[in-house]
Amino acid sequence: MTKVLALAEQVVRLPGAYYHYLQREGSAMNNKNCARNVEILYAFDDILGWFGEHGLREAYRDELTFLAISHLLIAASLRVARIASKSELLGQFSDYMEKNFPDFRENRYLPRLDRNKRLVYRLLLKRRYRVVRLLFRIKDGR
């Protein structure tokens, strides 16, 4: 979808929801196997490569950075931290962000994060993975 939007001449918003997303039981999103979450790094390598090949990486730098913040740094880190707060993957996600998006902390879209995601984002930056895990255990009632 990201690649399609980058090449679209026009984007319109429709009043209803016309896309039904299905999360399969074995998908990386629902899997209790931490190692499956490494796949998001491959996906971002693909996205960044495609945008680079098409000369669009710099034009969409802020948007790609925020996409990585949302999906890689926050969502994937949350999935892993909830399973194993000492997983090496958490460091790999942080390293990937530093290497590919060195100025991600100044991204202009960060204010769009809601309060909860902003809290998680700050905890992840400080590598407080056990605190994140504990917060979600409390939230989930476990």
Positions of predicted regions on the chain:
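Short charge-dense sequence patches
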Residues: 1, 40-46, 126-135
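Short, charged, amphipathic alpha-helical segments
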Residues: 60-66, 90-91
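Hydrophobic residues within well-ordered alpha-helices
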Residues: 3-5
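Nucleotide-sugar-dependent glycosyltransferase catalytic core
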Residues: 9-43, 57, 82-84, 88
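Membrane-interface aromatic/basic loop that binds lipid-linked glycans or pyrophosphate carriers
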Residues: 81-142
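C-terminal, non-catalytic tails of nucleotide-sugar-dependent glycosyltransferases
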Residues: 42-63, 102-107
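Short, charged/polar low-complexity linear motifs in solvent-exposed/disordered segments
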Residues: 38-39, 47-48, 76-79, 123
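Amphipathic alpha-helical repeat scaffolds of TPR domains
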Residues: 65-78
